[in-house]
Amino acid sequence: MTDWRIIAQHIAQTTGEAFNPQEPRTMGGGCINTGVRLGDGRRNYFVKMNRAALLDMFEAEADGLRALAQTRCLRIPQPLCSGLCNGESYLVMEFVEMGHSTRDGAALAGERLAAMHRFTQSEFGWIRDNTIGSTRQPNRLMTEWAPFWRENRLGFQLELAARNGYGGSLQHKGERLLEHFPVLLEHNPEASLLHGDLWGGNLAYDTTGQPVIFDPAVYYGDRETDLAMTELFGGFGRRFYDAYQAAWPLSPGYSTRKTL
């Protein structure tokens, strides 16, 4: 059973202010974590909890949230502290009261995502490995995009599938794809700062209509991967994509590359 006094004390130590929470309120934490709203009547925090062994997952998420927040392009829940409590790991972050998208909300999200993608570096990858969902995501830094995607994304996923007993035609097709991968990915993108897991469940709007992104799997990579992820499960709507294109048009061939 969670001892909320331990987490409250950690919050107080981090903020330098006393924090005596009321009864915690369970909220949606996704399909992986337990989510709890913890407040004292003045301040509210969102606490994500999971097994103790997954503390590193939360610490990597906090690093990613900070990196995204530094761009000041989209609203990001600010991480506060993380740790262990009675055999569980936790991550405490700013609680963002969610509302509904305004008429122009989707366009604003597209425009600001393009601005975030303008933050680049010379190498593809990230300062540490992290997770996408609860699956490990290797981020070894590399100077070229195609080898990075081949080894750290597609190749790693095929290897993971094989270790878990998945084979047959899908595995065979994947191996053939790896053999011809450089030919299929003949473009040299900049290494943009990416959310890394930007499907519809990880974008919302606060009470003022400002877009908020969360639950990242951050790394520097081809911005097209963020856009391709948004198209899963229904997409983000025409206003979003039109605004992104107006801010920073995608390179020719995206419609073919996005399937990878």
Protein language model regions, located:
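An alpha-helical support segment within catalytic cores of ATP-dependent transferases
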Residues: 2-17, 120-193, 206, 246
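Conserved N-terminal boundary motif of the eukaryotic protein kinase catalytic domain
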Residues: 18-25
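ATP-binding pocket architecture of kinase catalytic cores
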Residues: 25-147
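Alpha-helical structural elements of signaling/regulatory helical domains
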Residues: 71-74, 101, 166, 236, ...
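Conserved Rossmann-like nucleotide-binding pocket used by diverse enzymes
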Residues: 92, 194, 259
